[in-house]
Amino acid sequence: MLRHGPFVKALLLVGLAVSVFAQPTKWTPEAMIKYKRLLGTAISPDGKWVAYTVSEPLLEGEKSEYRAQIFLAAADGKMDFQLTQGDKSCTNPQWSPDGKWLAFSSSRGGDKNNIWLIRPFGGEAEKLTEAKSGVNNFAWAPDGKRIAFTMNNPLSEQEEKDNKEKRDAIVVDENFKFAHLYTISVEKNEKGERKAKRLTSGDFHVGGFDWSPDNKWLVFDHQATPRVNDWPTGLISLVPADSGAVKPLVAKTMANNPYFSPDGQWVAFGHDAGDTRWAGRTDIYVVSINGGAPRKVGETHDQQANILGWSADGKEIFYGETERTSPRVFAIAVSGGKPRTLTTGSGAFGGVSFSADTKTMAVVHQTPEQLPQVYVSSMLKFAPVKITTVNRDFPNHAMGRTEVIKWKSKDGKEIEGLVTYPVNYVASRKYPLVLNIHGGPAGVFTEGYTGASSIYPLQALAAANYVVLRPNPRGSSGYGVEFRRANINDWGFGDYDDDIGGVDLLIEKGVAHPDSLGVCGWSYGGFMTSFIITRTKRFKAASVGAGVTNLMSFTGTADIPGFLPDYFFGQPWDNLAAYQKHSAMFNVKGVSTPTLILHGEKDLRVPLSQGQEFYNALKQQNCPVQLVVYPRTPHGPQEPKFILDIGNRLLDWFDLYIRGKNGGKKTS
């Protein structure tokens, strides 16, 4: 069966009163923030229509949010219209098997996500569920009579009473609110009601799931607790769709993302073959529903396959994976062999969905200079036809060209990255360069649209005559397991050589000016930025975004305490020297690079204290430094006004300390 769905307190905030609706003549953060995000596709069972979701930034008055709505486009490109409206987001559209209904998620009429139903060609949406704690995932039964969903255990009456009376002390790692499986009938009973039926219970947390083709079973993955740190405990089980005992299917840990075969006799799933590491691998396996040993289907390029479903004839499994700088869709034969690429050509492909007969696909495609749009193609031969014009009112300014470049690191390892040149680039001129480092460290820079609003406004930097280098150093995804693990026990050294090697290449080519360098990054990119400025004074300015600056205190305060002990072969008390050697905080003496530190107040992944430690260390040494803390913000900024603020602050900081000017704007 195929599921349809898409593929990481300001101390002083000023300048937000400037209208974000002014019409700049070149790329600026104000221009880029208007970008609407295309979230994914859901093609109808007959392949004739595609539902897709667009998230629009709202910045008027007190608003600072993204609101998503569902649109519908004909596969022949002749019709395209907005389906849902309102002041609450509507996401995750899923077609009923007969194509007569679309189910979607929304918090309409409350503050919790529930499942809603709507006719695709007219009529009002109808609320299906009344999930007290909100619906997580959902999926139609193959016969269209029921929908399965997951919901976290709600608060008990006593817990609600305690909350009201301020008796709500929290005991850490106890009383988890596990997610469990439920079903609900689409048709109302004789009393005009719909009642959800709970299928699972107990001390485990349900993640992904799929229906059997005969509607009798649900296969699901589950882990020990909802904690992010417990992902290695993933198992796969079966449960009868009408209620009954849970039946273990895959007892090997780190098993996830199960899908039934079209004949209902097999389940495909992702598994790491016991090679469980945070710099992970996910191979594709199949197992009989009657049990037995799982069988590995074959090797994929990056061994990080995200299973998308089966072909209608049951001979192939579809999956998504990044190949170097291009996210793509692939198929691999269940009998084994090499994968075949379904989405050929340059750029990035994602948000894919398939018709019921798997003869037609819908996919979101984009390139560095081309906006993301929905395309439809035959599965026999990839010949995508564009059927949407999302962001038709988005600025059409001249763009800085982006290309993939390669270089050799100090140890001879080949490194790849993306360079975005200034708008109106002149080959005889040397430009200031910004080294932008991705997160992860197992992230990857891909060939996505560079005009999109993001933490770092690429085209605004290009319009301001900066060259932007985005390397994929050792530790990145997209280049295989060995490359992804090449930075184990080596953060800040081999990857440092990789990053600096790309900078040196652009200097040698006469593209970048050696005395006008800046560096920035978020998360692991923030770690790398903080560590780089402890090793060299070549950079005139730096910006550390939600960066890990002290490996020891990070391990003791983050929501993933198992992360760094895996990378550094033990806990801090067992390998103290490594944690000190690879931490900016233990090498911070003498740092003089002007540094802008940006951090979310509610960041659980990299707690705010990481930014505060580095800020205080630089402040005590009279190094130019500014710490900006964003209220309500988790590990990445979610509010468009904050994204806008970050972009403007970054540009101002680099202009001030790289070029010796600030463009007439304040930097504090």
Language model feature labels by segment:
Residues 56-60, 108-111, 154-157, 225-227, ...:
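Short glycine/acidic-enriched loop and turn motifs that connect beta-strands
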Residues 429-440:
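Short beta-strand element of the alpha/beta-hydrolase
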Residues 45-46, 97-98, 142-143, 213-214, ...:
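Residue-level detector of Asp-centered blade-edge/turn motifs that repeat once per structural unit
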Residues 23-37, 63-65, 72-89, 106, ...:
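Multi-bladed beta-propeller domains
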Residues 454-464, 469-668:
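Active-site-proximal cap/loop segments of hydrolase catalytic domains
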Residues 47-50, 99-103, 147, 215-218, ...:
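Hydrophobic beta-strand positions that form the internal "hydrophobic ladder"
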Residues 42, 58-60, 148-150, 157-159, ...:
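Non-catalytic accessory segments flanking enzyme active sites
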Residues 42, 94, 139, 210, ...:
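Conserved beta-strand position repeated across blades of beta-propeller domains
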